[in-house]
């Protein structure tokens, strides 16, 4: 009986460890991917950069994208 309980606890510990490693190794978001709902998931050389959307001076939303660190984007007309 003790062997069955011990085996169950060991299996539970192994499964928990595997799940924790999978959580730490989740895939990062590549460049130009939307990160509005997951700002911390951009790959290491990228940053989640957010922009407000306005129409007639009223804010209508926000967009966030994984972009290169230190790069400034300007609007072209």
UniProtKB/Swiss-Prot annotation:
One GO CC annotation: extracellular region
Transmembrane regions listed in the UniProt entry: none
SS bond partners: none
Propeptide stretch(es), residue numbers: 21-26
Signal peptide: 1-20
Tissue-specificity statement: Expressed by the venom gland.
Gene Ontology MF, one: toxin activity
Pfam family, one: Toxin_35
Name this polypeptide is given: U8-lycotoxin-Ls1t
Native organism: Lycosa singoriensis (Wolf spider)
Organism lineage: Eukaryota, Metazoa, Ecdysozoa, Arthropoda, Chelicerata
